[in-house]
């Protein structure tokens, strides 16, 4: 009898831990993919910056610091403390919105030799993975709710024909914002993944 109870306990433990193991695997894949996208974003931005004169870099950086990224309309944690206090579902939903906001603009990214053609399909794959994680972490009553963030305004006339100076500024802003947002998503997914391991230290 004692042996049967022990065996039943082990089976129950394995079954109950299976969803956690699946989530950990999905999180590992998602984190790996966004890390790759973040590296691509850094490379694109670095390649573009290296093609500029020193004064051009200084002026563009000054302008960018006064501007906002299009994705700033997506409400996200303001600092690392708020990030750590946010729920897993909230971090996943914000990440989903950020990734989705780049599906169209990513087609217009440019900057040296970085393989930009890889970016759009990788964003789509990451978005699908995050959606699976959202579904896995939702309550049953919420399972059919829309995880998308509010509709993000378009990039205005970025895709229209622009003068040389304006085009340079817009390209700089687009690449800088893409790098910034991929860093955000990497941070949010890493923290959310860490939450699945109670013994882990999830401090940023």
Curated annotation (Swiss-Prot):
<keyword id="KW-0862">Zinc</keyword>
<dbReference type="Pfam" id="PF00103">
    <property type="entry name" value="Hormone_1"/>
</dbReference>
<feature type="binding site">
    <location>
        <position position="186"/>
    </location>
    <ligand>
        <name>Zn(2+)</name>
    </ligand>
</feature>
<dbReference type="GO" id="GO:0046427">
    <property type="term" value="P:positive regulation of receptor signaling pathway via JAK-STAT"/>
</dbReference>
<dbReference type="GO" id="GO:0031667">
    <property type="term" value="P:response to nutrient levels"/>
</dbReference>
<feature type="disulfide bond">
    <location>
        <begin position="69"/>
        <end position="177"/>
    </location>
</feature>
<comment type="similarity">
    <text>Belongs to the somatotropin/prolactin family.</text>
</comment>
<dbReference type="GO" id="GO:0060396">
    <property type="term" value="P:growth hormone receptor signaling pathway"/>
</dbReference>
<feature type="signal peptide">
    <location>
        <begin position="1"/>
        <end position="17"/>
    </location>
</feature>
<keyword id="KW-0732">Signal</keyword>
<dbReference type="InterPro" id="IPR009079">
    <property type="entry name" value="4_helix_cytokine-like_core"/>
</dbReference>
<dbReference type="GO" id="GO:0070186">
    <property type="term" value="F:growth hormone activity"/>
</dbReference>
<keyword id="KW-0964">Secreted</keyword>
<dbReference type="InterPro" id="IPR018116">
    <property type="entry name" value="Somatotropin_CS"/>
</dbReference>
<feature type="binding site">
    <location>
        <position position="36"/>
    </location>
    <ligand>
        <name>Zn(2+)</name>
    </ligand>
</feature>
<dbReference type="GO" id="GO:0048513">
    <property type="term" value="P:animal organ development"/>
</dbReference>
<dbReference type="GO" id="GO:0045927">
    <property type="term" value="P:positive regulation of growth"/>
</dbReference>
<dbReference type="GO" id="GO:0005615">
    <property type="term" value="C:extracellular space"/>
</dbReference>
<keyword id="KW-0479">Metal-binding</keyword>
<keyword id="KW-0372">Hormone</keyword>
<feature type="modified residue" description="Pyrrolidone carboxylic acid">
    <location>
        <position position="18"/>
    </location>
</feature>
<dbReference type="GO" id="GO:0005131">
    <property type="term" value="F:growth hormone receptor binding"/>
</dbReference>
<dbReference type="InterPro" id="IPR001400">
    <property type="entry name" value="Somatotropin/Prolactin"/>
</dbReference>
<comment type="function">
    <text>Growth hormone plays an important role in growth control and is involved in the regulation of several anabolic processes. Implicated as an osmoregulatory substance important for seawater adaptation.</text>
</comment>
<protein>
    <recommendedName>
        <fullName>Somatotropin</fullName>
    </recommendedName>
</protein>
<feature type="disulfide bond">
    <location>
        <begin position="194"/>
        <end position="202"/>
    </location>
</feature>
<keyword id="KW-1015">Disulfide bond</keyword>
<dbReference type="InterPro" id="IPR034975">
    <property type="entry name" value="Somatotropin"/>
</dbReference>
<dbReference type="GO" id="GO:0046872">
    <property type="term" value="F:metal ion binding"/>
</dbReference>
<keyword id="KW-0873">Pyrrolidone carboxylic acid</keyword>
